[in-house]
Amino acid sequence: MDISRWLERHVGVQLLRLHDAIYRGTNGRIGHRIPGAPPSLLLHTTGAKTSQPRTTSLTYARDGDAYLIVASKGGDPRSPGWYHNLKANPDVEINVGPKRFGVTAKPVQPHDPDYARLWQIVNENNANRYTNYQSRTSRPIPVVVLTRR
C-alpha cells in the first residue's frame, strides 16, 4: 500500500468522521464549506432494511438547479448504505448548510447518455478523486442527481 492510500485510510477517514459529526451536530450550520475542499451536504434517508432515519455528509457538485452526489465509497466493491436507502425510497431530504429541503434522487449509471457529462462535473469538482476510486473497483460508480421537489 502506498503512503497516500495509507494516509487516506488512517487519517482521512478519521477527519471525515469528525467533519460528519460536526456538520450533523450543528444541523448544517458548521461544515458546509471547508477551505480547499468541495462543499458538503447532509443526506437524510430512511434505512431500506431498518426503516430508521439515516444521515450522512457527502461532497456535492451542481448541475444547474440539481445537486450531484457520487456513490463511490472510496472505490469499495460495495455501494454505500445510503445508496441502497435512496434506491428503496428516492424521496429524501438534504441540508445545504442549515437549509433543509426535499429532493428526489435519480441514480445515473454509465450506460445512461448523460453519465459522462455528469461524471466530468463531479470528478473535476472533487480534484479527480472519483477516477482514482473507479480504478479500485469493478463496480460501476453511479452519479446521483438530486432534484428539488
Swiss-Prot record:
One GO cellular component from the entry?
plasma membrane
Q: EC class of this enzyme?
A: oxidoreductase
Give me the reactions it catalyses. oxidized coenzyme F420-(gamma-L-Glu)(n) + a quinol + H(+) = reduced coenzyme F420-(gamma-L-Glu)(n) + a quinone
On whether Oxidoreductase is a keyword of this UniProt record, the answer is yes
Where in or outside the cell?
A: Cell membrane
Q: What is its EC number?
A: 1.1.98.-
In the bilayer, the protein is annotated as: Peripheral membrane protein
State the Pfam families in the record: F420H2_quin_red
Q: Which domain of life is it from?
A: Bacteria
Cite the GO molecular-function annotations of the record: coenzyme F420 binding; oxidoreductase activity
Q: Write out the residues that bind coenzyme F420-(gamma-Glu)n.
A: 48-50, 54-59, 70-73, 81-85, 130
Keyword Hydrolase attached = no
The alphabetized UniProt keywords are:
Cell membrane, Membrane, Oxidoreductase
Family as reported in the entry's similarity comment: Belongs to the F420H(2)-dependent quinone reductase family.
PANTHER family to which the protein is assigned, alphabetical: F420H(2)-DEPENDENT QUINONE REDUCTASE RV1261C (PTHR39428:SF1)
Q: What does this protein do?
A: Involved in a F420-dependent anti-oxidant mechanism that protects M.tuberculosis against oxidative stress and bactericidal agents. Catalyzes the F420H(2)-dependent two-electron reduction of quinones to dihydroquinones, thereby preventing the formation of cytotoxic semiquinones obtained by the one-electron reduction pathway.
Protein name, entry field: F420H(2)-dependent quinone reductase Rv1261c
Record organism: Mycobacterium tuberculosis (strain ATCC 25618 / H37Rv)
